[in-house]
C-alpha cells in the first residue's frame, strides 16, 4: 500500500525508497516481527483463558510431551496478523501474485483455525473432516493458481503456453505444457506444501525455522525470477511481477521470528494448524508462481521427508499390520529412539539449511 506514495517522490525524495523491493522486503520483515512482538502476549493470554486445557496431547506420543499439557494453540493467529499486516503496508496490492498468495495464506489459515477450534473444544485430535478439509484447500489453491496462470499467460514473455507449463531445474529451456491441468498440478503443490508443514509441526520450534529458511530461499528466487537481468543471467524463467513476492516472504520471516520468541522451549504457545497450513500454503504458492515447484521439493525436503514417513507408515501398516517407524511423523521416531527434543529440532534445522543451499545451487546449474 505504501508503494503508492512513490507518486509523491517528486516532492519528497525519500519516498523513492519505496520503489525498491529490497527495501520493502526488509521493512516488511521488521514490521511483521514488531506486530507479533507487540500483540503476541495479549493473544497468548486470551487463548490460554479461552482454551483452558489447550491443545490435546497424543496419548501414544513420547512421555516428555505430557508436560506440555495446557499449552494454548492457534498461535498461527499471531503469524497471520504479522504477515497480512506487513504485506498490506509494504507489498504492491495491485500485483496478482501478491493477492493470490495472501488468498491462500488467509484461506488455509481459516481452515486451520476451524480445525484447531474443533480439536480444542472436543479435546480430541479428530478435528475437521480430512476429505472436506482437503477439498476446500484444493478449491482455494485452484483459484489462486488459475489467476496466476492467466497472469503469466497474459505477460507473453515466454510464449502463449508459459503459464500452464512445468519448468525443470538443471535444464535451460525444457518445459512441459499441461494446459488447464496446471491448475490441478499447482493446486496439488500448494495443498501438499500446506499439509507437509502441518505434519512437521510437532515439536517446539521444529517447523517455524525450516519455514523461515524456505521463505528466505524463495524470497531470493522470487526476486531473481522477477528481474529480467538476473533471470537472463542465471538462465531461469523470467516471470514478471513475482519479485513482489519477496516482500510477502519478508513478512513471513518476520512473523516467524516473532513467533519463535514465544515458541522457543518451553513453548508458551503452539502455532497449530492455523499457522502451519497457512505457512506451507504460502511457500507452495510462491513456488508455483515462480515456476520452481520441483525445486521446492529440494528446499522443503525436510517437509517432504516428514510427509513420506507418514505415507510409508500408514501404507505399510495397512498391508502388513507392522510399522516401519516407532512413530510417525519421523521426528517422533527419533524421540522414541532416545533423542532429546532439542537434538531432534536442531539436527532437523541443520538438514533444512543444507537442503536450502542445495536447492538454491540449482539456479546456477543449467
UniProtKB/Swiss-Prot annotation:
Q: Which domain of life is it from?
A: Bacteria
Cofactor(s) essential for the protein: Mg(2+)
- What family is it from? Belongs to the glycosyltransferase 4 family. MraY subfamily.
Q: In which pathway does it act?
A: Cell wall biogenesis; peptidoglycan biosynthesis
Coiled-coil residues: none
Task: Kindly state one GO CC term assigned in the UniProt record.
Answer: plasma membrane
Q: Which GO terms describe its biological process?
A: cell division; cell wall organization; peptidoglycan biosynthetic process; regulation of cell shape
Tell me which InterPro entries the record gives. Glycosyl_transferase_4, PNAcMuramoyl-5peptid_Trfase, PNAcMuramoyl-5peptid_Trfase_CS
Where are the membrane-spanning stretches?
27-47, 71-91, 93-113, 134-154, 174-194, 205-225, 245-265, 268-288, 294-314, 343-363
- Naturally occurring in which organism (per UniProt): Rhizobium leguminosarum bv. trifolii (strain WSM2304)
Tell me, what is one Gene Ontology molecular-function annotation carried by this entry? UDP-N-acetylmuramoyl-L-alanyl-D-glutamyl-meso-2,6-diaminopimelyl-D-alanyl-D-alanine:undecaprenyl-phosphate transferase activity
User: What EC identifiers does the entry list?
Assistant: 2.7.8.13
NCBIfam families given in the database record: mraY
**Is Transferase set as a keyword in this record?**
yes
What protein name does the entry list?
A: Phospho-N-acetylmuramoyl-pentapeptide-transferase
Task: Please name the PROSITE patterns in this protein's record.
Answer: MRAY_1, MRAY_2
Q: Which PANTHER family match?
A: PHOSPHO-N-ACETYLMURAMOYL-PENTAPEPTIDE-TRANSFERASE, PHOSPHO-N-ACETYLMURAMOYL-PENTAPEPTIDE-TRANSFERASE HOMOLOG
What is this entry's stated membrane topology? Multi-pass membrane protein
Keyword annotations of the record: Cell cycle, Cell division, Cell inner membrane, Cell membrane, Cell shape, Cell wall biogenesis/degradation, Magnesium, Membrane, Metal-binding, Peptidoglycan synthesis, Transferase, Transmembrane, Transmembrane helix
Query: Catalysed reaction(s)?
Result: UDP-N-acetyl-alpha-D-muramoyl-L-alanyl-gamma-D-glutamyl-meso-2,6-diaminopimeloyl-D-alanyl-D-alanine + di-trans,octa-cis-undecaprenyl phosphate = di-trans,octa-cis-undecaprenyl diphospho-N-acetyl-alpha-D-muramoyl-L-alanyl-D-glutamyl-meso-2,6-diaminopimeloyl-D-alanyl-D-alanine + UMP
Amino acid at each position: 500500500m505504501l508503494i503508492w506514495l512513490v507518486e509523491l517522490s517528486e516532492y519528497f525524495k525519500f519516498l523513492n525508497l519505496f520503489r525498491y523491493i529490497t527495501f520493502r522486503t526488509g521493512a516488511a520483515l521488521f514490521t511483521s516481527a514488531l506486530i507479533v512482538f507487540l500483540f503476541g502476549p495479549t493473544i497468548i493470554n486470551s487463548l490460554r483463558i479461552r482454551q483452558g486445557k489447550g491443545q490435546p496431547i497424543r496419548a501414544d506420543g513420547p512421555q516428555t510431551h505430557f508436560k506440555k499439557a495446557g499449552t494454548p494453540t492457534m498461535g498461527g493467529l499471531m503469524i497471520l496478523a504479522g504477515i497480512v499486516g506487513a504485506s498490506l503496508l509494504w507489498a504492491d496490492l495491485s500485483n496478482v501474485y501478491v493477492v493470490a498468495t495472501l488468498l491462500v495464506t488467509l484461506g488455509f489459515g481459516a481452515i486451520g483455525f476451524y480445525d484447531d477450534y474443533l480439536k480444542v473444544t472436543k479435546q480430541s485430535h479428530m478435528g475437521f473432516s480430512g476429505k472436506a478439509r482437503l477439498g476446500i484447500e484444493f478449491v482455494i489453491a485452484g483459484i489462486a493458481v488459475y489467476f496466476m496462470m492467466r497472469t503469466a499467460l497474459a505477460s507473453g514473455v515466454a510464449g502463449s503456453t508459459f503459464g500452464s507449463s512445468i519448468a525443470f531445474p538443471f535444464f535451460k529451456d525444457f518445459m512441459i505444457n499441461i494446459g488447464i491441468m496446471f491448475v490441478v498440478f499447482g493446486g496439488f503443490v500448494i495443498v501438499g506444501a500446506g499439509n507437509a508443514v502441518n505434519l512437521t509441526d510437532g515439536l517446539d520450534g521444529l517447523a517455524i525455522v525450516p519455514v523461515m529458511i524456505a521463505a528466505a530461499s524463495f524470497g531470493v528466487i522470487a526476486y531473481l525470477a522477477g528481474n529480467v537481468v538476473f533471470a537472463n543471467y542465471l538462465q531461469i524463467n523470467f516471470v514478471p511481477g513475482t519479485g513482489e513476492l519477496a516482500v510477502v516472504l519478508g513478512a513471513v520471516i518476520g512473523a516467524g521470528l516473532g513467533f519463535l520468541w514465544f515458541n522457543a522451549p518451553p513453548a508458551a504457545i503452539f502455532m497449530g494448524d492455523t499457522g502451519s497450513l497457512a505457512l506451507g500454503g504460502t511457500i507452495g504458492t510462491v513456488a508455483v508462481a515462480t515456476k520452481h515447484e520441483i525445486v521446492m521439493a529440494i528446499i522443503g525436503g525436510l517437509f517432504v521427508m516428514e510427509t513420506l514417513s507418514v505415507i510409508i507408515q500408514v501404507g505399510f501398516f495397512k498391508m502388513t499390520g507392522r510399522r516401519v517407524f516407532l512413530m510417525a511423523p519421523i521426528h517422533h521416531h527419533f524421540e522414541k529412539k532416545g533423542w532429546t527434543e532439542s537434538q531432534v529440532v536442531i539436527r532437523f534445522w541443520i538438514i533444512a539449511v543444507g537442503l536450502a543451499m542445495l536447492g538454491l545451487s540449482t539456479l546456477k546449474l543449467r
